[in-house]
Amino acid sequence: IMLTLADIVRAQQRLTRYLQPTAVESAPELGAGVLLKLENTNRTHSFKIRGALNAVLALDDAARARGVITASSGNHAQGVAYATQATQTRATILMPKHTPQKKVQGVRRYGGTAVLFGDNFDQTEAEALRRARDEGMTFVSPYNDRQVMAGAGTIGLEILQQVPDVARVLVCVSGGGLISGIATA
C-alpha cells in the first residue's frame, strides 16, 4: 500500500467535522522534553477511531449502503462502530470469542453488530474476509488499509502543527498502520 501525504491531508479534512485534535502534554516524569499525544481523549479512547472513521467516510454511497465488516478485539471495533453510527452505515464487527465484555459492549453502545467468532484473531479475520466477499460488504482492516493508515497519519500532522520543532516521535508498533501513517506525515 503506497500511502501519500495527500492521503493524510484528505483524511484530516474528512475527520475535522467529527474529531477534535488531541492535546499534547508534557510528561516530566518520563524525562526532559518528553511530550505525550493524548489519543485516549478521543471519543472511543483510542487513536483507532481516526482510521476507522476515515475509511468509512471515504466510501461512496453504494459501498456504505452495502455495509462494512471488520475483525477486531477492541479499539478498532469500537472505532468502526462509532464511524458507522455517525454515517448511518450498517456494521458487522467480528471479534474473537475471548474478547472482554467491556469491548463487546462498547461496540454495541455505538450501534455495531458484534459477532463473537474464532479462537484467535486469524480465525476471526478470515471469517470477516469471507463474509465481506460473500455478502458484498467492505472489509475495513484494523491496520492494512490505506484509508485507515491515512486516518492514523493525522496524528503526525497534528504533532507537526502543535510541536513544530519536534525532534523525534516514538510510536508503538503492532500491525504497522499507525507508524506508517505517522511516518508519512
Pin down the residues of each PLM region.
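PLP-dependent amino-acid enzyme catalytic core
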Residues: I1-A185
